[in-house]
From Swiss-Prot:
It is an enzyme of class 2 (transferase). The gene is rlmE. SUPFAM superfamilies: S-adenosyl-L-methionine-dependent methyltransferases. Specifically methylates the uridine in position 2552 of 23S rRNA at the 2'-O position of the ribose in the fully assembled 50S ribosomal subunit. This is Ribosomal RNA large subunit methyltransferase E. S-adenosyl-L-methionine binds at G60, W62, D92, D108, D133.
Length: 220
């Protein structure tokens, strides 16, 4: 009975969420697009000509936002013809519906086969921006969840270290709680500039936050 009440309450909040309504109106697959939008507007992350990699991209709202932003950077005639000023690669183990001008690779980005596909798209270019809205399945057990969250962030950090330009940036989703300070410390070891971000589109009740790292300390 309690679970049913929780589901009904969540559904009511979801239906009446202004960001959900806005996403439906503007064609985004999820309200998460507005989290990236707010952070991008604050930190000027996405710029014409960039190479962007979206980790854990499905269902694709972050890639949609990045695509729309890079489309704005095209000259007027080029926009009519389609295309974007830049490259976006979306990676996920789950399937994802196609997005115009976005290269989607399905698979685990730790595996060689997936990395070879990524390298084929990049054609020797390094990455300007890595974005990750990945989150593990949470159990409700604080210690176990902290380890899972840290592991996901570690994966994004390792990917960024291997693929980012020296002046590149990494944006990842994280959660406040046990283990958060350790994740921030890892960012500080890897990046010269580290900043937490809590966009308004993140629900007030959620411990969700984002960590932005810029300028690698030890580029490869």
């Amino acid at each position: 009975m309690a679970k049913n009440r929780f589901n009904q309450h969540w559904l009511h909040d979801h239906i009446n969420d202004p960001y959900v309504k806005m996403a439906q109106r503007e064609g985004y697959r999820a309200r998460a697009a507005y989290k990236l939008k707010e952070i991008d507007e604050q930190d000027k992350l996405i710029r014409p000509g960039q190479v962007i990699v979206d980790l854990g991209a499905a269902p694709g709202s972050w890639s949609q936002y990045a695509r729309n932003k890079l489309a704005q950077g095209k000259k007027r005639d080029a926009v009519r013809e389609g295309g974007i000023d830049g490259t976006i690669v979306a990676l996920d183990m789950l399937p994802m519906e196609p997005i115009a001008d976005v290269h989607f690779i399905q698979g685990d980005f730790r595996e060689d086969e997936v990395l070879h596909q990524l390298e084929a798209v990049l054609e020797g270019r390094t990455v300007d921006l890595v974005i990750s809205d990945m989150a593990p399945n949470l159990s409700g057990v604080a210690s176990a969840d902290a380890a899972r969250i840290e592991h996901v962030c570690d994966l994004a950090l390792e990917f960024a270290q291997n693929h980012l330009k020296p002046d590149g940036a990494l944006l990842v989703k994280c959660f406040h709680g046990s283990g958060y300070s350790q994740i921030v410390e890892k960012f500080k070891q890897q990046f010269k500039v580290v900043a937490p971000r809590k966009p308004k589109a993140s629900r007030d009740k959620s411990s969700e936050t984002f960590i932005l790292g810029r300028h690698l300390k030890h580029p490869r």
